[in-house]
Amino acid sequence: GKNFIEENFHNNYVWETVMSLGEPDSEIFVRRYKFDEKIKDISKAMGLNISTVKTRLSRGKRKLRKMLSNAEERL
């Protein structure tokens, strides 16, 4: 199944939050969740280790979850 980020990627707020992660994290997220690229392809295209891409994705997801849940509390 899709995760929260994949399901809500079209949502403007989620998109802006992803972009606020900054490079290279935002590019990794766009490649992974918007264009559905494989992690090994992302690592090759960006010149990063596969483990680096995985780490940045999981850290970024944690950050996004925190930012998005904070935003929900404010709504």
For every predicted segment, state its role.
Residues 1-19:
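Acidic, proline/glycine-rich intrinsically disordered inter-domain spacer in sigma factors
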Residues 40, 46-70:
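DNA-recognition helix of helix-turn-helix
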Residues 24-25:
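The N-cap/first-turn positions of alpha helices
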Residues 36-37:
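Residue-level signal for the short linker/turn that defines the boundary of a DNA-recognition helix
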